Curated annotation (Swiss-Prot):
SUPFAM superfamilies: beta-beta-alpha zinc fingers. Belongs to the krueppel C2H2-type zinc-finger protein family. This is Zinc finger protein squeeze. InterPro entries: Zinc_finger, Znf_C2H2_sf, Znf_C2H2_type. A zinc finger (C2H2-type) spans 158-180, 186-208, 214-238, 244-266, 275-297. Residues 70-97, 131-142, 419-443 have a biased composition (Low complexity). It comes from Drosophila melanogaster. It comes from the Eukaryota. Disruption phenotype: Death at larval stage. Larvae display a motility defect whereby the body wall musculature overcontract radially during the peristaltic wave typical of insect larval motility, apparent as a 'squeezing' of intestine. PROSITE patterns: ZINC_FINGER_C2H2_1, ZINC_FINGER_C2H2_2. Largely restricted to subsets of cells in the CNS throughout embryonic and first instar larval (L1) development. Expressed in a population of lateral interneurons, primarily projecting axons in the anterior and posterior commissures. Overlaps with ap within the thoracic ap cluster. By stage 17, it is restricted to 2 neurons within the ap-cluster, with one neuron typically continuing to display higher levels of expression. Selectively expressed at higher levels within the FMRFa Tv neurons. Expressed in all leucokinergic cells.
Length: 535
């Protein structure tokens, strides 16, 4: 059985333990700000001394013996069970005192203590081993169950329920659970930033104060760091075969050339674009960027060469360079746009419209309605028939029967068919010759007021015995104009015509030229009669 030692001052161990526990509890009531500000002066130093004394106490009382027993348990020995049974009651005799002695709060050691003590908590923490030893006795777990555990479970028996990480100490597990729960009890009073661990807060405060407690112990190296990890990375430069180190960062190099290439990165000219491309003029800060850019130029040149070869091959095969797919697409677009009219002038548009109308119009008697030559012939025939009817009415001594007047009206309103066209022309010519002879015999010589171009109202009135057949002069003139208007309306086509057809129709004799044609015919007949009489 191991006896509890006395304190260094000769005070019994029980009083010493109770007094240390009271001091630790009083420290636990302090705020975070007091812990931070009182870190260097007084309270924390006493706490360090207490922790050091407890570590020495744990090392002196059964720690080495417990480690030896663990090694013996791993080795096959016939008396293994007897030793375990003998060791088990010894641990059960003093579990309360050991638990009380390790009830101190968790706080990491300072950098100086880490360098002096060289204490690795992940390797063999004394608190974990003593608590595991006491826990095995208190929980009543048999040594057989402990022997069944693997080496990994013995090294890190505390597993996190949220992730797959395991820890060697329960305090480390409690610190790790703060990450999952989002608990950050330590806060910086300068920038109000919060942390899950006190060590993280201490490292953060050094960024505000500029303290660098981790100094390099290599001869002739004056560097110091605020974090231990930076010191460890720096110490590798002295341990390896890289004597050439950069004064601006922690990197080391094996030769001087690589160091000289690395140094310009820390100068003021590191942002200057000194590497220029000879092809396009672009500039870059590093040569690697320029090389990547030149690779793009090479890829573009290869693509252009492939395109040129494809164009040459297509030209030799008489295939457009655009490809068959584009030609098919263009043909499809032309087919879609075929429903729309192409851009053309007014005359060409009117001519195309006239052709379309003539093709669509129904043909009656083998001749289309849009044939203006046939319409013009019909106009001339109607004019001749009207003149013949008027001259018969104007000739003195010629008696008009109702049948003749009806026949004359029928001639005016009737449209000649193409079959009797030649016969009617011959008859009209004969009638005109006969009328001219009769007019030359019965018509007096033209006076100064009677001219071939005088209007109809200025002509000589007929004899009284013909007034009953003719009616007043105004009625005869009105009847003539009505007949001309009816003929013009019948001659004009009812379908839509084009602008080109309208232009041609304006230059042809139509409804507006009927009256002028009558006067012209009368004048010619009078001149011919005068010539015959003179002969």
């Amino acid at each position: 059985m191991a006896e509890l030692p006395t304190a260094p001052n000769g005070v019994p161990s029980g009083d010493y333990l109770h007094r240390s526990i009271d001091q630790l509890r009083s420290l636990g009531h302090l705020t975070t700000a007091q812990l931070v500000h009182d870190y260097k002066p007084f309270n924390i130093s006493e706490f360090r001394q207490n922790v050091a004394e407890r570590l020495d106490y744990s090392l002196k009382n059964g720690l080495v013996q417990h480690q030896q027993q663990m090694v013996m348990e791993q080795q096959p020995h016939p008396d293994q069970q007897q030793q375990q049974h003998l060791h088990h009651p010894q641990q059960q005799q003093h579990p309360p005192q050991l638990k009380v002695s390790y009830s101190a709060p968790n706080s990491p050691p300072t950098p100086h203590e880490q360098q002096e003590q060289k204490y690795d908590p992940n390797r063999s923490p004394p608190r974990q081993q003593m608590s595991s030893a006491s826990g095995s006795g208190s929980n009543g777990s048999s040594p057989e169950e402990e022997s069944r555990r693997g080496d990994g479970d013995q090294a890190k028996p505390y597993k996190c329920g949220s992730c797959s990480k395991s820890f060697a100490n329960s305090s480390y597990l409690s610190q790790h659970t703060r990450i999952h729960l989002g608990i950050k009890p330590y806060r910086c009073e300068i920038c109000q930033r919060k942390f899950t661990q006190l060590s993280h807060l201490q490292q953060h405060i050094r960024t505000h104060t500029g303290d660098k407690p981790y100094k390099c112990r290599h001869a002739g190296c004056p560097k110091a760091f605020s974090q231990l990890s930076n010191l460890q990375s720096h110490s590798r430069c002295h341990q390896t075969d890289k004597p050439f180190k950069c004064n601006s960062c922690y990197k080391c190099f094996s030769d001087e050339m690589t160091l000289l290439e690395h140094i310009p990165k820390h100068k003021d000219s590191k942002h200057l674009k000194t590497h220029i491309c000879n092809l396009c003029g672009k500039s870059y800060t590093q040569e690697t960027y320029l090389q990547k850019h030149l690779q793009k130029h090479a890829e573009k040149a290869e693509k252009q060469q492939h395109r040129h070869t494809a164009q040459v091959a297509a030209h030799q095969q008489h295939v457009p360079a655009s490809g068959i797919g584009l030609n098919l697409q263009r043909q499809a677009m032309n087919d879609v746009n075929a429903a729309y009219w192409a851009k053309m002038g007014a005359d060409s548009a009117a001519a195309s419209l006239a052709e379309a109308i003539q093709q669509q119009l129904p043909q009656a008697g083998g001749q289309p309605y849009g044939n203006f030559a046939s319409l013009q012939q019909q106009h001339q025939q109607q004019q001749q028939e009207l003149l013949h009817h008027q001259r018969l009415a104007d000739t003195p001594g010629h008696s008009h029967s109702p049948h003749e007047e009806a026949a004359g009206e029928d001639l005016v309103l009737r449209q000649s068919t193409p079959q009797h066209h030649l016969q009617q022309q011959q008859q009209q010519q004969q009638q005109q010759q006969a009328q001219q002879q009769q007019q030359a015999q019965h018509q007096p010589s033209p006076g100064p007021g009677n001219s071939a171009f005088t209007p109809l109202s200025a002509t000589v009135a007929p004899p009284p015995h013909l007034q009953q057949h003719r009616g007043p002069p105004g009625s005869a003139a009105a009847y003539l104009y009505q007949q001309n208007a009816a003929a013009a309306a019948a001659a004009f086509p009812t379908q839509l015509i084009s602008l080109h057809q309208i232009r041609n129709y304006a230059h042809q004799p139509g409804a507006a030229g009927l009256i002028a044609g009558d006067h012209l015919a009368l004048g010619l007949s009078a001149v011919n009669a005068a010539k015959e009489k003179a002969q």
